[in-house]
């Protein structure tokens, strides 16, 4: 074989790895295998496990948002707030102490943590991943591990931002709803207080009697007015003309009208034109009765002629009328074509009625859409447009908005929606009393999804543990089993069970249609039950598959459905084995065979810098971090408003009604006059006897009159005192009750002030404690960082001393592991010298 000349770069020998050593970007073939050998397996697994835990913890920390339970509690308390004021003063006091909850949270308010902390977590995750990768795969493993750690931390960061935005939106929605409910509670209480004040004024207005003078002043005026109005309406219903002299005589019956049973013109006062130029007329043969013709000098008469001519379908009259008034073609042509051609005797009335009920801008064809009667029909393209205009739900506010719209179509739709809401306003059959015949299938058509619903779903009963059963819009319920609208039917299950629809809920809807038409048919019921059981079985099978797949993902050693065996690798499309990689590196021709490394058995020493790195990163994060006062803000956000109470004053007062003395005096006068007349009649003409009797009677009359006056005065005085005492007691009771309520409200306000003072004190103490802890943490991080730097410098100083000793020959090896030899007498011993033999003279 011919020798090939190898070009050298400079004076570097071609085989630069003959003596071993580290190489950048390449490792020996035993690097990966050594990491998982028996003696190194524990360290490798521990390093990887620790790195994975740290990376996962960094991602979770970056994705975590602040605790919003305090904000949610505030919203709930605001939503359930009840205004307890019973007077205007209490209402104003409670209104003054009430505060709206915040409803403009941004995603930064609920994000929690700080940017510096997340930066620190990201750097730490990347460092842990790089360290774990380096312990297994060298520099390439370090790069891979760093990328994995960095991706996990950044993914958690971005996921936390999205989660905070959704949470802020939800909190703002709940806060706005709570504020609206609180304002509604204030408005309702204000209306109730105003009504109670009116009742109190009415009770006190005539506490001592007197005419009320309501209405028009006459007693029973309002009742009589309503009675007369009802009589008037009754007369109108009976076709009585109440304003005419014969208003109490009914009009003639309909069969006495000139109903043209035998034909004739609609009006006798017609202009027949001149003899030379008479108006076109309808001959008598075209009418129901003879001896009449009908001129058509005007369009109104022409319309009448068209209607009358249509009785017999006379085309000649129709042509005459339309020749004189061509404009009636668009009005009456198609109408009477359909009338004549479709059994006029049955549909004439409906056709005319539909024409006169049409709106001016509609055409005659539009007037004929309901000429045969039936339900109201809405075009398919127009269905749901007004509901969409209202945002999915038609309300009174949306109807008012639509009726005030500048678009005439929107106004018509709003009017139709308003009328449709009153179709059952006066009652109707609600399918009660056993008349609700269903097949047992329930459709959940409203409520939104579990994520959209503020109550996490629509409750349908509770389970044996008391937890509510929640469903969402789109699902179908049958026999306490819910068919999901989220789970899509796999193709193999759809073919096996012969299901229709994309989801199991749609399949259930399709399967129940036949039974919906015949809910009481036993065969349909059995078929429905069998179909639902088949769909339920298919859904359970699909759910079991999903659970099995989820369990396989939870335990990486199980690959029942396949998957990536190394989720943290590079996921190469064409993976290679270690032997293939070694062969590829040998064949590259750039370098020689990599010699085995001589220091593979040495332990890692770079971890001794971990405390310094950690303290440095913590100190770096302190530059961007701020103390977290969320707990203190949670306490300060609690509403400590005063609770006000009210009282209901008693309006039960007595009226003073004195004894009517004049009534009894008149009675006595009548009795005395009768006595005198009787004495005079029985005296027999003897004036002395009459005079004596009259004097005695008058004496008794005077005595009785005096007794009546005195006793009546005493009775009235006692009655006045009793009435005043009773009313005084009522006023005292009302005053005492109001005083107690005022005292309670004052004490409640004072207690609220003391509570707010305690709240402010607690918040200040918490904030100061948090501030002190933050300062101590910063000081500890800086102290540890400086202490670590000092320890590292002291270690380097000692290493320099050892290197100096090794260099001077005292030690045979320096701190880098290099052999330095040392002096020949380094081990000590006896010094041997050459001595002369013989006798020596001194």
Swiss-Prot record:
Localization terms from the record: Virion; Host membrane
Coiled-coil residue windows: none
Biased composition (Basic residues): 1-11, 824-842
Region of interest called Interaction with the portal protein, as start-end residue ranges on this chain: 425-552
Function: Protein that is stored in high quantity in the viral capsid and may play a role during ejection.
GO terms classed as biological process: symbiont entry into host cell
Keywords from the named record: Host membrane, Membrane, Transmembrane, Transmembrane helix, Viral genome ejection through host cell envelope, Viral penetration into host cytoplasm, Virion, Virus entry into host cell
Recorded GO CC terms: host cell membrane; membrane; virion component
Compositionally biased spans, kind Low complexity: 20-29
Transmembrane stretches, start-end: 140-160
Membrane-topology descriptor: Single-pass membrane protein
Region (Disordered) residue spans: 1-29, 817-842
Subunit organization: Homododecamer. Interacts with the portal protein.
Protein name in UniProt: Cargo protein 1
């Amino acid at each position: 074989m011919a020798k090939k000349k190898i070009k050298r770069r400079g004076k570097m020998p071609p085989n630069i790895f003959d003596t071993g050593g580290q190489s950048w970007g390449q490792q020996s073939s035993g690097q990966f295998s050594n990491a998982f050998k028996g003696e190194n397996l524990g360290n490798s697994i521990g390093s990887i496990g620790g790195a994975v835990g740290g990376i996962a913890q960094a991602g979770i920390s970056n994705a975590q948002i602040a605790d919003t339970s305090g904000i949610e509690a505030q919203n709930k308390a605001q939503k359930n707030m009840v205004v307890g004021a019973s007077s205007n003063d209490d209402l104003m006091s409670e209104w003054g102490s009430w505060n709206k909850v915040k409803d403009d949270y941004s995603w930064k308010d609920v994000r929690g943590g700080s940017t510096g902390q997340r930066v620190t977590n990201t750097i730490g995750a990347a460092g842990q991943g790089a360290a774990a990768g380096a312990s297994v795969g060298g520099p390439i493993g370090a790069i891979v591990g760093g990328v994995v750690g960095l991706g996990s931390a950044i993914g958690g960061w971005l996921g936390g931002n999205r989660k905070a935005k959704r949470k802020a939106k939800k909190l703002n929605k709940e806060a706005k709803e709570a504020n609206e409910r609180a304002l509604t509670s204030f408005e309702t209480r204000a209306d109730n207080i105003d009504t109670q004040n009116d009742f109190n004024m009415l009770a006190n207005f005539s506490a001592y009697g007197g005419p009320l003078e309501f209405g028009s002043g006459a007693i029973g005026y309002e009742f009589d007015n309503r009675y007369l109005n009802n009589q008037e309406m009754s007369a109108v219903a009976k076709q009585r003309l109440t304003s005419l002299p014969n208003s109490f005589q009914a009009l003639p019956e309909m069969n006495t009208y000139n109903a043209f049973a035998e034909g004739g013109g609609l009006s006798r006062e017609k202009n027949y034109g001149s003899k030379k130029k008479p108006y076109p007329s309808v001959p008598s043969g075209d009418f129901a009765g003879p001896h009449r013709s009908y001129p058509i000098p005007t369009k109104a008469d022409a319309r009448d002629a068209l209607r009358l001519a249509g009785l017999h379908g006379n085309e000649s009259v129709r042509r005459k009328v339309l020749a004189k008034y061509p404009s009636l073609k668009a009005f009456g042509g198609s109408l009477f074509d359909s009338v004549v051609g479709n059994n006029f005797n049955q549909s004439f009335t409906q056709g005319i009625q539909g024409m006169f009920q049409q709106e001016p801008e509609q055409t005659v064809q539009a007037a004929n859409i309901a000429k045969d009667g039936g339900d109201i029909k809405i075009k398919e393209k127009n269905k749901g447009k007004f509901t969409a205009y209202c945002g999915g739900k038609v309300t009174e506010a949306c109807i008012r908005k639509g009726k005030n719209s500048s678009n005439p179509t929107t106004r018509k739709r709003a009017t139709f929606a308003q009328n449709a809401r009153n179709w059952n306003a006066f009652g109707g059959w609600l399918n009660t009393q056993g008349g609700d015949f269903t097949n047992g299938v329930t459709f959940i058509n409203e409520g939104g999804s579990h994520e959209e619903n503020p109550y996490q779903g629509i409750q349908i009963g509770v389970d044996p543990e008391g937890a509510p059963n929640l469903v969402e819009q789109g699902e179908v319920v049958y026999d306490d089993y819910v068919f999901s609208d989220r789970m899509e039917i796999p193709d193999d299950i759809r073919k096996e069970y012969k299901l229709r629809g994309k989801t199991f809920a749609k399949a259930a809807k399709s399967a129940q249609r036949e039974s919906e038409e015949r809910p009481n048919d036993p065969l349909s019921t059995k078929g429905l039950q069998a179909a639902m059981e088949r769909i339920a079985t298919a859904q359970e099978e699909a759910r079991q598959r999903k659970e099995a797949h989820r369990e396989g993902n939870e335990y990486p050693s199980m690959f029942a459905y396949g998957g990536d065996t190394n989720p943290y690798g590079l996921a190469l499309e064409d993976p290679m084995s270690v032997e293939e990689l070694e062969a590829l590196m040998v064949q590259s021709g750039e370098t020689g065979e990599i010699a085995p490394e001589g220091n593979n058995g040495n332990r890692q020493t770079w971890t001794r810098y971990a405390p310094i790195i950690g303290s440095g990163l913590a100190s770096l994060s302190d530059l961007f971090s701020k103390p977290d006062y969320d707990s203190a803000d949670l306490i300060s956000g609690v509403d400590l408003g005063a609770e006000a109470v009210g009282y209901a004053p008693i309006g039960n007062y007595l009226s003073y009604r004195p004894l009517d003395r004049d009534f009894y005096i008149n009675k006595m006068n009548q009795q005395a006059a009768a006595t005198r007349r009787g004495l005079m009649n029985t005296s027999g003409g003897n004036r002395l006897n009459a005079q004596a009797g009259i004097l005695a009677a008058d004496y008794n009359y005077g005595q009785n009159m005096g007794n009546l006056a005195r006793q009546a005065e005493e009775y009235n005085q006692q009655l006045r005192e009793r009435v005043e005492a009773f009313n005084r007691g009522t006023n005292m009771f009302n005053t005492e009750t109001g005083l107690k309520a005022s005292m309670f409200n004052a004490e409640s306000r004072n207690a609220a002030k003391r509570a707010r003072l305690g709240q402010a004190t607690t918040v200040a103490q918490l904030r100061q404690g948090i501030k002190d802890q933050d300062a101590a943490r910063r000081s500890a991080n800086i102290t540890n960082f400086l202490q670590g730097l000092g320890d590292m410098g002291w270690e380097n100083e000692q290493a320099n001393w050892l290197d100096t000793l090794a260099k001077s020959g005292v030690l045979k090896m320096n701190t880098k592991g290099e052999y330095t030899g040392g002096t020949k007498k380094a081990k000590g011993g006896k010094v041997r010298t050459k001595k002369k033999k013989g006798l020596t003279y001194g």
